[in-house]
Regions:
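Terminal-tail/helix-coil boundary detector
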Residues: 201-212
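Phosphate-coordinating loops and pocket residues in cytosolic domains that bind phosphorylated ligands
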Residues: 46, 194, 203
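Residue-level recognition of oxygen-bearing side chains
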Residues: 68, 184, 197, 203
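Short secondary-structure boundary/hinge segments and terminal tails
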Residues: 37-38, 74, 189, 209-211
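GST-like domain detector, emphasizing the conserved glutathione-binding G-site
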Residues: 1-130, 144
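Conserved beta-strand edge residues that scaffold enzyme active sites
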Residues: 34-35, 185, 206
Length: 212
């Protein structure tokens, strides 16, 4: 059986868990408590010398980095797919571009907002909060535009959508309504929330907010 080493509030681990659920793959979840420094233990560093989760161990294969793990799962367990068909290289590129956008220009910003909001109200940097709000709002406006006439970002449900899901689910608790005045984003989120793989993340929202 596969093993997934993960910290439940981690959005990158959540990406992998969505894919595992979509593919109905069974695995053993081994929780790595980042707050307790489990990621720096020698036995974990042997799996990932960069001391980061998630890490997937599938028999004799060890893979780290959420994007690489998902690509491995897609190659090894192709059905059902989470990437567009190989016959559509343009759509596959679009899906990967949006996953990268989520990883670099959305998830980190929401994480920084979570960290700032975790401070006592009088200690929050209001200027930083405003900058983070603007950055996230711009990303949501862009997504609203890119979803025009589409149910998902790259054809069918794919890694393009999966990359955004973990942090989209916490925005409401941070005072941001992703779908407000963004009908395409609003409908997109509702479609994703119909999927059991996404519904399973809702239970860890509180953990994510508490674990910053």
């Amino acid at each position: 059986m596969m093993k997934l080493y993960d910290f439940l509030p981690c959005p990158f681990g959540q990406k992998v868990r969505i894919v595992l659920a979509e593919k109905s793959l069974t695995y053993e979840l081994i929780q790595i408590d980042l707050a307790q420094g489990d990621q720096r233990r020698p036995e974990f560093l042997r799996l990932n010398p960069f001391a980061r989760v998630p890490v997937l161990v599938d028999e004799d294969t060890t893979v780290y980095d959420s994007t690489v793990i998902i690509e491995y799962l897609e190659d090894e367990y192709p059905e059902p797919p989470v990437l567009p068909s190989v016959e559509s290289s343009a759509l596959r590129a679009r899906a990967r571009i949006f996953e990268d956008f989520a990883d670099t220009s959305f998830t980190p910003q929401v994480g920084q907002l979570m960290a700032e909001m975790a401070r006592a109200e009088g200690e929050r940097d209001q200027g930083r909060l405003q900058r983070l709000h603007r950055s996230i709002e711009r990303a949501l406006d862009y997504l609203n535009h890119e979803l025009t006439g589409q149910q998902f970002l790259a054809g069918d449900f794919s890694i393009a959508d999966i990359g955004f899901a973990p942090r989209l689910l916490v925005l409401g608790e941070l005072g941001l309504e992703a779908g407000l005045n963004r009908p395409n984003v609003d409908a997109w989120i509702k479609r994703m929330l119909e999927r059991p793989s996404i519904q399973s993340l809702q239970g860890v929202t509180a953990e994510a907010l508490a674990g910053v």
